[in-house]
A protein has these predicted regions:
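Substrate-binding cleft and catalytic face of glycoside hydrolase catalytic domains
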Residues: 1-151
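Glycoside hydrolase catalytic-domain groove-lining segments
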Residues: 9, 16, 123, 155-175
Length: 175
């Protein structure tokens, strides 16, 4: 919640499936996020407003969202789940407006979140790694799109000449 409290009884259905997967021998888990918690979003919702091209995550909550992701990872790791990957953004090329949980992202916003998440993983002493880039279609990884969203991500994130979006040097980025 807005005070930093966690209710671990929420998302009981997802937790049930994790328990069953572990019971049947799954030994690696990936945590991903559709949206930041609403207390961290610009509009107070888990979806973006129409016409928004950048992230719905408020500029002053990148570190908070990263901490939320790592606190959640630590909680489930402590419960015996081998959380190996954290995917902080889901299909960032889409609008994700009313009726669908999610957020559009630009490469700049993703890189900013990745840097905060890298710090938080290190601070919490986790072994999980960041899974990026993330795309709804293969072409978003290597082509420019019509929207000013997460496109041509391989170039943006891994070419050292892209100083605002380069994340290839992050310690906790999956290679």
């Amino acid at each position: 919640d807005a005070n930093g409290n966690y209710d671990w009884t929420k998302s009981a259905g997802q937790q049930y499936f994790m328990q069953q997967a572990k019971k049947y021998g799954v030994d690696h888990f990936l945590l991903f996020s559709n949206s930041a918690p609403v207390q961290f979003t610009k509009n107070g919702k888990a979806c973006a407003n129409k016409g928004v091209s950048g992230s719905n995550l408020a500029d002053n909550h990148y570190a908070d969202f990263a901490k939320f992701l790592t606190t959640t990872t630590k909680h489930f790791t402590d419960k015996g789940y081998n959380i190996t990957l954290i995917d902080p953004v889901n299909e960032p090329q889409y609008d994700w407006t009313e009726g669908q949980e999610g957020s559009p992202w630009t490469n700049e916003c993703i890189a900013k979140l990745a840097r905060e998440l890298d710090k938080s993983i290190t601070d919490q002493g986790l072994s999980a790694q960041i899974l990026l880039p993330e795309a709804c279609q293969w072409k978003a990884l290597y082509q420019d799109g019509t929207e000013k969203r997460a496109n041509n991500q391989i170039e943006a994130f891994f070419n050292t000449s892209n100083s605002s979006t380069y994340i290839g040097d992050l310690k906790n980025l999956k290679r």
